[in-house]
Amino acid sequence: MSFRTIDYSISGVLAVSLLLLSISFLFGAGPNTISDTFSFYGLTEWVPVATLGIVFGFALMVAAGLVILQQCKIVPAAWPLTLVAIISLFTLLTLFAENRWISAHGGFPVIGSGQGIIKYFALVPIALFLYCRHHINTRPLVWANYLPVALVLAWIGGMKFLELEAKAIVPLVETSPFMSWMYDLFSVQEASNIIGAYDLLMAGLLGIGIWFNQRILIGVASLGCLAVFVMTQSFLFTASGAFSDMSLLGGLGQFVIKDLWFIANIMVMASLTLESSPPESLESAVA
C-alpha cells in the first residue's frame, strides 16, 4: 500500500470521526460532556451550555473540513495541524478536573468521564504523521502513535478488573454477537478480567515489538490491538444508546466513534514499521 493511499485512508478516518462528532454536538448531543469540559475554564458561567455545544461542534466541523481540504492541497498543513492540536489540548487539560475521576473510589487513577477524554491523546500523533513527517524521524513518530494506544488499552483495560467497570460493560458485551458467549462460560467479573488482560497483553506486546524492532511481533500485536477497536465500532450497531434521533450520535456513540482515532494510530505504526523500505519523505527526514 502506497503512502498516498495511507494518507487518504487516515485522513478519511479522521475527517469522518470529527464530522460525526461535530454534527452531534451541533444538534445538542452530550450537554453533560460540554458542561464538564467548558466548566473547567469557567465558561459555563457566562455562556449557555447549548451555545458552547454549538461552538465546539463548529470547531470539530472546521477541523474535519481542513483535513479534507489539506488532502486536496487547498490549505496549508499548518491549518489542520494547529486546530487539531488546539482541540486536543483544550479537552485534555480538563483531566485536571475532579469530575473526570470517580471520587467514590478515591479519584485518580480510577477514571470516570475521563475515559472519553484520554482518547484525545490520539489526535496530535495522527496529525504529526499527516502533516509533519518530513521533519520527524521515523522512530519517534512510531512511539508517538503507540503511546495513545497503549495508554487507553492499559488504563481502560486496567479498569476492567474493577467491579464497577465489569458491570458497566455488561450492556455492551451481552448484546455483542462476538462477545456475548463469554457470559455463558464466565461470570461478569471473570469475563471483564479476561477482556482487561487481553488489552494489557496486546499493548505490552506491541511496545516490545517496537522496542526491539520485531516486525512479526509488531504485525501480530497490531492486529490484536486493531481487533479491540474494530470490536468497539461494532457496538454502534449492537448496543442501545449509540445513536440518537435528535443528535445523530448518542452518549455511547460519541464515546465509541473516537476509537477510530486509535485505528488511525495503528495504521500509522504499521505503515512506518512494516513497510519493506521507508518512504522518501522519511528517508529525507532521517538524512
Where are each of the predicted segments found?
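Membrane-interface extramembranous regions
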Residues: 1-287
